[in-house]
């Protein structure tokens, strides 16, 4: 389907459930895609939207055959569940120059084939369930600007290794719960909050390295089989002793 000149918006639920659409070519004048516009358009494979600035809630949710999404530097808003349930989506490219500040809640929830994500440099928050059950997502570049990772943001993701940015301040509850391929994690020195169950269920996680004392540490942040590397006599060390976690010292 080609959307020609003269259109600036695709209306709410405009093509919801349309199973005949296969390729979407939106004219550069189209600035906004409203809620549920292409919800459950199960035959759509490709989209081209060079001028879009706003993608509203559930706009492409349930497009189970969609394979890729390239979002330009004009992108300002991408609301929750925008691409949730797009099970064949393998690649998402958000322009490095995009002004978007947050990956909203559940944006890519259960995109189980997603294996490549490019984030804008200015992202400060990854929302709740943003990459929930993205089981093929083995690597992820965390922008230096990132301050918060939300609850269950990467629940059961396929991450094999992560490098958390130095200025990260909060890891939410169950943020990396059941990331079963993770083997090592270093917590940055500016982190203030580690939510409960943050790295619990990461069965291969051998070492969680924490060289400082966060202000708040939740319960069961790792499995008992994981060693927590910290400074002897620190508050982190006491937390480990009180909760029965194995320790290694710097």
Language-model features: where?
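A generic structural signal for ordered alpha-helices
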Residues: 16, 37-38, 85, 218
């Amino acid at each position: 389907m080609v959307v020609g000149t003269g259109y600036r918006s695709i209306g709410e639920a405009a093509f919801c459930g349309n199973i005949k659409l296969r390729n979407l070519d939106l004219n550069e004048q189209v600035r906004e895609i409203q809620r549920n516009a292409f919800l459950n358009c199960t035959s759509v494979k490709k989209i081209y939207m060079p001028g879009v600035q706003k993608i509203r809630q559930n706009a492409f949710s349930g497009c189970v055959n969609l394979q890729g999404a390239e979002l330009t530097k004009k992108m300002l808003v991408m609301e929750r569940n925008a691409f949730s349930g797009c099970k064949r989506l393998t690649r998402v490219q958000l322009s490095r120059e995009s002004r978007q500040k947050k990956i909203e809640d559940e944006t890519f929830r259960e995109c189980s084939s997603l294996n490549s994500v490019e984030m804008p440099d200015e992202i400060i928050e990854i929302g709740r369930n943003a990459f929930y059950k993205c089981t093929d997502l083995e690597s992820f570049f965390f922008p230096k600007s990132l301050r918060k990772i939300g609850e269950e943001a990467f629940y059961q993701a396929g991450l094999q290794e992560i490098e958390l940015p130095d200025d990260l301040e909060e890891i939410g509850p169950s943020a990396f719960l059941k990331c079963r391929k993770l083997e090592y994690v270093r917590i940055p020195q500016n982190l203030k909050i580690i939510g409960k169950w943050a790295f619990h269920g990461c069965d291969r996680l051998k070492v969680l390295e924490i060289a400082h004392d966060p202000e708040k540490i939740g319960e069961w942040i790792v499995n008992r089989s994981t060693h927590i590397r910290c400074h002897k006599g620190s508050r982190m060390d006491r937390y480990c002793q009180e909760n029965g976690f194995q320790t290694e010292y710097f």
